[in-house]
């Protein structure tokens, strides 16, 4: 499959030692370990971009490398086979993924993958909060246990999806999009996956025409840097605090407190990824959004996005340089 998904502008490694590629992937894309073949000298290649909270990665190890991951914790992996094949093993199951097929890993899925010598993949890392937000914005119901997808899919299930990824890659490499624009693209990708691939999400529209929920969400968006009390939200929704909890559980799949915290974290991440935001320090932006305990803020951020806020800011400055 010959698709232009990230070009030399996003090149991190070429003809590189596989362990160097693996170390970089561990930092930005997903925790794993690799096992190399006994013979030969594989030469890895890697392209990488961060865009709208997503990590976009094109990778080849250049040899028959085995990749083992204990799980992604707070992120999903969409892995599209571009060249060669990849053997996937899971609880007694085996499948050789070929070009045109894709593997979707849930946060708690362990992975045991063996690349062919000519295997090349395009990987999209989606933080769970991006999919959660897509559920909320589309008025779909997220299960209490979290969103889960089936593992094996074909690109034919996602009509036009590869072209969408090409557009996103082009946007990431050639323009300095505003954070809101980047979030919009990320939301389209998440919505497309939820709509077209098998998952446990109910797409029955729950909150259509629910002015109370829409009014509360709008208030939260307009006051992310302020201390938002549950009492004020209940007053806006014209209901009791207990009914407010039920409202958020029904329409957002989480509590009001978690929803507010996640939106604050997403807004901070957008600023850290925006070169024009001129972020002077992590401490300053955390305090701006009401996170007074910096250690807890960093841990919440890492749980949501799989990296520390300092990692996000460092990567943004690296791309600008």
Swiss-Prot record:
Keywords: Activator, Aromatic hydrocarbons catabolism, Cytoplasm, DNA-binding, Plasmid, Transcription, Transcription regulation. The keyword Transcription applies. GO terms for biological process: catabolic process; positive regulation of metabolic process. Residues 214-315 form the HTH araC/xylS-type domain. One of its GO terms (molecular function) is sequence-specific DNA binding. GO terms for cellular component: cytoplasm. Gene3D superfamilies: Homeodomain-like. Residues 231-252, 282-305 bind DNA. It is found in: Cytoplasm. Regulatory protein of the TOL plasmid xyl operons. XylS activates the xylXYZLTEGFJQKIH operon required for the degradation of toluene, m-xylene and p-xylene. This is XylDLEGF operon transcriptional activator 1. It comes from Pseudomonas putida.
């Amino acid at each position: 499959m010959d698709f232009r998904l990230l070009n030399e502008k996003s090149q991190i490694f070429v003809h590189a030692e596989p362990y160097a590629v693996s170390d970089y992937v561990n930092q930005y894309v997903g925790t794993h370990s690799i096992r190399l073949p006994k013979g030969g000298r594989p030469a890895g290649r890697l392209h990488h971009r961060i865009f709208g909270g997503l990590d976009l990665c094109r990778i080849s190890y250049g040899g028959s490398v085995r990749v083992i991951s204990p799980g992604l914790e707070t992120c999903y992996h969409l892995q599209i086979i571009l060249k060669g094949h990849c053997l996937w093993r899971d609880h007694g199951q085996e499948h050789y993924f070929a070009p045109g097929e894709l593997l979707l890993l849930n946060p708690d899925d362990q992975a045991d993958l063996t690349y062919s010598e000519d295997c090349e993949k395009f990987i999209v890392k989606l933080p769970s909060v991006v999919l959660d937000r897509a559920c909320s914005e589309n008025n779909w119901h997220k299960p209490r246990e979290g969103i889960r997808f089936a593992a094996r899919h074909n690109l034919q299930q996602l009509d036009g999806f590869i072209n969408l990824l090409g557009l996103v890659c082009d946007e990431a490499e050639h323009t300095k999009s505003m954070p809101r624009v980047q979030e919009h693209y990320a939301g389209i990708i998440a919505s497309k996956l939820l709509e077209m691939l098998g998952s446990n999400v109910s797409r029955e529209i729950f909150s259509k025409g629910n002015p109370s929920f829409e009014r509360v969400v709008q208030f939260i968006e307009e006051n992310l840097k302020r201390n938002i009390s549950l009492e004020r939200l209940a007053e806006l929704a014209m209901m009791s605090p207990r009914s407010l909890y039920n409202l958020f559980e029904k329409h957002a799949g989480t509590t009001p407190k978690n929803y507010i915290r996640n939106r604050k974290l997403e807004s901070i991440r957008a600023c850290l990824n925006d070169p024009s935001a001129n972020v002077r320090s992590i401490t300053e932006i955390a305090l701006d959004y009401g996170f007074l305990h910096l250690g807890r803020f960093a841990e919440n951020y890492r749980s949501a996005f799989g990296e520390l806020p300092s990692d996000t800011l460092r990567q943004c400055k690296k791309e600008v340089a």
